[in-house]
Amino acid sequence: MIYGIGIDITNIDRFKTLHNPATFIQKVLTPTEFDEFEAKKGQRAYEFLAGHFSVKESYSKAYGTGLGKKLNFQDIEINYDGVGKPKIVKHPFSGTVHVSISHSDHHVVTQVILEGDN
């Protein structure tokens, strides 16, 4: 049974002009995600940050709460398997989570499907 579906599209270029990037990055990325982000350079770093931001937005929409008092960026952690497939490894939902990320030169689109009962 599908519990929720969330989708988000984000402009990667907006992450290049953040007024306080360190604060934003600490807010969005978990410590584990930050370690992986630190290894990225140039455009790939912006794609990584935008992708993680967008996945967390999609997750919050599928979960039905949005990001705010009940759910924040640190409640959700994204990881990758051996072939680069994204997976959400930390989250409050008790069922199965499916995630998809796609990039173009300027945009990232993500979808999260929550399956099962919470």
Curated annotation (Swiss-Prot):
SUPFAM superfamilies documented for this protein: 4'-phosphopantetheinyl transferase (SSF56214)
Keyword Lipid metabolism: yes
EC number(s) stated in the UniProt entry for this protein: 2.7.8.7
Pfam families: ACPS
MF-aspect GO terms: holo-[acyl-carrier-protein] synthase activity; magnesium ion binding
UniProt catalytic activity: apo-[ACP] + CoA = holo-[ACP] + adenosine 3',5'-bisphosphate + H(+)
GO annotation, biological process: fatty acid biosynthetic process; lysine biosynthetic process via aminoadipic acid
List of residues binding Mg(2+): D8, E57
Record's GO cellular component terms: cytosol
Purpose: Transfers the 4'-phosphopantetheine moiety from coenzyme A to a Ser of acyl-carrier-protein.
Family affiliation: Belongs to the P-Pant transferase superfamily. AcpS family.
Protein name (record): Holo-[acyl-carrier-protein] synthase
